[in-house]
From Swiss-Prot:
Part of the 30S ribosomal subunit. Contacts protein S5. The interaction surface between S4 and S5 is involved in control of translational fidelity. One of its GO terms (molecular function) is rRNA binding. One of the primary rRNA binding proteins, it binds directly to 16S rRNA where it nucleates assembly of the body of the 30S subunit. Residues 96-156 form the S4 RNA-binding domain. InterPro entries: Ribosomal_uS4, Ribosomal_uS4_bac-type, Ribosomal_uS4_CS, Ribosomal_uS4_N, S4_RNA-bd, S4_RNA-bd_sf. Signal peptide: none annotated. Belongs to the universal ribosomal protein uS4 family. This is Small ribosomal subunit protein uS4. GO terms for biological process: ribosomal small subunit biogenesis; translation. It comes from Blochmanniella floridana. The gene is rpsD. SMART domains: Ribosomal_S4, S4.
Amino acid sequence: MAKYVGPKLKLSRRENTDLFLKSGIRSIDSKCQFDHAPGQHSIRKSRLSDYGVQLREKQKVKRMYGILENQFANYYRKSASMKGNTGEILLQLLESRLDNVVYRMGFGSTRAESRQLVSHKSIIVNDCIVNIASYQVVPNTVIQVYKKSHNQSRIYAALEIAEQQRESVPWIEVDSAKLKGIFKRRPERSELSANINEHLIVELYSK
């Protein structure tokens, strides 16, 4: 599948917020001038149209989870077909992706690194190796690092970063010593980032 391979900080600058695309070892504030868009002579416009605001919100969430347009649109269509709040369901589907759950458990320092762990067959889901990053994790699923991958120092470095810098996620339980965790349930909207306005995304796709 195609993926973005350009500068990650450029994406955060474009969306005017930290998309958590870097490991978090050092703050990106000194590198990212959030009051300016990317480009040597860029000037951030003071006001966007309603469509522009909606589009930027969609782009921000896409880039945060590392998903391209077609796949993101599929997630929206699926969430719209399900009973309940479309925006909240959309975020729950994104949070239930295997690469994101691995990231939330702290086994990868970024979602991109977590996706790599999955694609390299380093992750076991309910006693079976799964190498599909978009695999939808259901409640009460046990996820662990494959024993042959226990010698990867980056996993322990990621766990240390997660323990020091990330907020706790109550829908996930992790045993760092065993490199194992349980996805207990899907998160409630109140437990997810307040920096996401999913209603704008719903408005955009509803046009």
